[in-house]
């Protein structure tokens, strides 16, 4: 039998009153006796401190403070220590007879908080002869000793051979060692466990029924069913992990898409930018070289343009100088033409106006005569009309007023008298005494005839007067003409001068006729002279362009030479054109071939990438399409073999899973029907009874029971008979054994044990021989061992199955990849490398470009020579026809001679133009100048006489006319008679009035007609006079203007002036055209020079910028390449197919990827920041950093339990292979892991039943415990009603609540909590989560209610409460409960600790005087029966009969306080024996 460990002694070093005191502890009861303040509590406090060195729990209060929530300020420890190093050590010996010293080093910490520093330690391997006080003290002399500090103690112990010293930094480690060595009964894993242990010690220390323990008896007494709970937790953890893995797979599936998307977009984003920079670097290098070539070419062009500009500027200056002279000449010629045209127009006007004046003169004279006659007739008509009017008026007046009529008659009488007077005057004037009124009319005609005759005679004289006056005017006119031509002279000299002028006029007219021929001759000579000058200018220009002076005789030979050169150059240019066309054609063919290859290159590169990937995946090299198809056949064969092997491993794994599931059944039943039958029969499975059998005993019991190892143990077989009738749902062989499940043993068989076998005598005539199984399955330990081995095998099989599944799917994916490759790339994959051919073609293209450039330069020089030769030939073609002009030296003299003759002729023409009209007028009347007419005065007198005679005749005719007109008045002779009373006067007046009115009307009409005619004649005359005066004045103005012009206007003057002007205009236009051409060419040349200068500057700037950019980009590119190579991403980024895309396409690709990446990394702050930094176009290396960050991020997110690679791209490929396999496997695993609600109910019920049985066993040990009136103590265990209902529903009505247990969103614990809430809606769950509640419901202890009951006197069984018991009864009852707890802890920990160790049992009791002698004896008996040590403190009047007693007396010696200790052991019936070391020397300060 295993001996129980014991505490041997307690050692106090430097405590208050104890300098170095060791208390040897009794195997049962150690009593500390002494008065108040003797040190009993200090001793117990030292023991507790060494046992539980946790300052958060230690609180040593006095007994009077029991129940108080606060004690002394230092919690009772600081004041119990002395200054300096203190120790409290427990010397123990365990079941293995190992001596172990555990203890603590204590030291007061200075300060107001009164803290204590505690360091736990342990000493193993210490010899039994060494006392604890000798370890920690050093003797200085006979009366002085020194306490060793902990480091010196360590050094001292390390010097001792075989002694181990351990210092602990953790209380958990300290207690773990104590548990493993059997010093304490329970493993204290946490602060909660330490608290329970301390409350237990504290309750025993102060005595009584501790409410802290009784309220949580389940935690103290009922062991945590760690196996069941761990099984549930493992199941839930496995399910949770399984679901989390499934969720992780779903997340990984989404991650796979995210990875694909992120890697794809990141690769597109960075690779596009990477390749764009690579392309741009190459483009920049090409541009830099191109800029350098263009710079050299532009400099050459600028030098040529500058030379050209100087030549054109010199020629333009010459043309500008000539243009001024030509403009002046042209302006003079234009002015002269205008003057000639003006003079001709004036001359025409003068001639026209002279003709008009002559005509107007004639018409004016005729009109004057007509007007004079009309005036005379008008006067006669007016007189006649007036007389008729007067007569009418008189007659009207007479008729109106008779008196007036009388006056009229008187007037008429007067008129009659006047008429008579007129008749007498006519007689006197006409010298006609016989003239009467009646004969007056006849005489009137006679005298009118005389008047007409006199008028005709006067007109004849007037005509003669006019003719004389005309002759006089012709002489005057001729004289005035001579004066106008020659100037003033005497009248008698006019004849001679006129003849001289006429002769001179003839000569001048002859000269004037020569003007036109001379002018034509001069124009011809001047034209030849100008052509000569133009030829000289062309020759000078030609010589200047040729850079050499040529003689006239050399020009024809030079012309032939230039034509020959043109022919040769034309052939060269033609041949060069053909050669250039051939080179261009070859270049275009190369370019077309390069374009086709560039279009084919991405396809070929994609095929090569796919081929390389296939080669990497399969580790083979393929050189032809046949190799690919052959390997594909091998791949199919390998796939079939892998599938067969995978299916075999899967079948074995399923078999192992089924065996594990069968062995994992609760109670060891391999058939679920046995559990139902056991519950139905009220029995227990035999495997449950032997569930705790050890692994070593499992083969024996398995062989012992043989086939009946799965029997059901029932209390009474007779009661089972009725249940067996009609039983079908059971195994083929059902074994039933009668026996008590609580005290079942193997006595039912007669057994003989052999070597690794047993012989079981079932009956007298039936034996059974059974060998020990190699793999026993009887008992939980055996099953767990088998399950563990099966799990190991399953892990191997699972790993192998996963490997094979992975290989199969990998092979399938490889087969798919080969199929895709064959379908997409096989046709082009094994063709020649287009990029190598492109490089060759590019080198050839460069050579062609260089040849074309050289050819263009040569052709340009030949073209320049050809153009120069053509210009020379063109110039010679213009010069050669004018060689005779160049050789004519007298042309200028002839021009001057003709110009002088032309000037003379033009003077004569101007004389003729100026005086030609006067000479023409003078010539017909020049003869009148010979004599001056003298009879003009006599003619004037005759004309005056005729005029007098005509007037006299007119007077006589007028007088006769008056008589004739007053002929009516002679009829008024009877007016006297009318006044005397003639009665018919009125009638006569009326008749005369009518006659007078008729006469008046005729006179008015005649007067009106003659007045209109006269007005018309006067108007015509006024118009003629006005026209004549106007034209005369205009004629005079025109003549003056013509004289002012000073140009002779002949018929050829205008034509000559126009020809001259046109010639000058043509010359000026040609000069201006050439000047404009030169100016435009010069402007264009200057613009070209400016453009070339700007282009040169820009090219220089661009070249240097590009060169600097190339240099800078080279450094940045080197950094990028270094970063790419260091991180191993060059293969991912250097995608050669992107090199054939344009920069815009790559930028667009990068921008699109950037937009997608912004959305993809929106939730990742790190990647978002790195992406934002990578957007800087000036820092391309940041994009590489982003790509590396993406790879690192994806590597971190790769689930290593699913994917075993660091490469995200390979991870994606493996994901697609693994995910479907893992999904299927985990789904089946979840179905296997899930436990039914009925199984949970059965497990909890079985556990409750087992613990109830255990509590009954504990109660049996307490049946004989009595304290005072308490006769017995027991624990009552009941199942809570709400939890019992939950178990019933789980086992019987679980189908109604499958919505909870089949939900993938709820764990089993959460589903259990939901069911509990559904069954008990009245219970408030508070703030606890369903998971917490479910975990509590999986703990069987929460299903039980426990309470302590005592059998006290006549009250019977009642609940143990301090108020219902006396103090001693309460102390005894509490001690009994504590003993039960300790025993329960030991049973609970037996599986955790070694089988050969039985832990120490020790309790305390302070102030034991409250117990009577019978109760103390009961405690002693309890300690003896339970092998428990007890330390009690009691006053001096307590004297136990057994155990060891220490009598403590506190004394003061020389101001030093110490405790005097005397120890006694078993004073009755043995003699007292003084224990060693009972006297203690006074403590001295060291």
Swiss-Prot record:
NCBIfam families: PRK04863.1. This is Chromosome partition protein MukB. SUPFAM superfamilies: P-loop containing nucleoside triphosphate hydrolases (SSF52540). GO terms for cellular component: cytoplasm; nucleoid. Residues 326-418, 444-480, 509-603, 835-923, 977-1115, 1209-1266 form a coiled coil. Pfam families: MukB, MukB_hinge, SbcC_Walker_B. Residues 666-783 are annotated as: Flexible hinge. The hinge domain, which separates the large intramolecular coiled coil regions, allows the homodimerization, forming a V-shaped homodimer. The lineage of its organism: Bacteria, Pseudomonadati, Pseudomonadota, Gammaproteobacteria, Enterobacterales. HAMAP family: MukB. The keyword Nucleotide-binding applies. One of its GO terms (molecular function) is ATP binding. GO terms for biological process: cell division; chromosome condensation; chromosome segregation; DNA replication. Keywords: ATP-binding, Cell cycle, Cell division, Chromosome partition, Coiled coil, Cytoplasm, DNA condensation, DNA-binding, Nucleotide-binding. ATP binds at residues 34-41. Its main location: cytoplasm. Homodimerization via its hinge domain. Binds to DNA via its C-terminal region. Interacts, and probably forms a ternary complex, with MukE and MukF via its C-terminal region. The complex formation is stimulated by calcium or magnesium. Interacts with tubulin-related protein FtsZ.
